[in-house]
From Swiss-Prot:
Source species taxonomy: Bacteria, Pseudomonadati, Pseudomonadota, Alphaproteobacteria, Hyphomicrobiales
HAMAP family: UPF0386
Short name of any one Pfam family annotated for the protein: YjhX_toxin
Disulfide bridge map: none
Protein name (Swiss-Prot/TrEMBL): UPF0386 protein RHECIAT_CH0001945
Amino acid sequence: MDISRTEQRILHLMAQGGRIEISRDDDRKIENVSCFTRDGWLYPGVDLDLFRRLKRLKAIKSSGGQPYRITERGLTLVRSQLDNR
């Protein structure tokens, strides 16, 4: 399955240890999505639509109220890239 360039970029970041945190409003609806690198830096470019697409693809998942992490399916979707470290 092909995924877009932005989805690929976020999944690669999450495969290296990144996470997605959400904040909810008073009605328990998701109002804000933030993506953090493994070093704790806020990564721009993740919006609610991209978050929903990744969730629909079952590439990310949250368990026990923890931040969203990449799943095994997400790891198979992401194409390998060279790490700059």
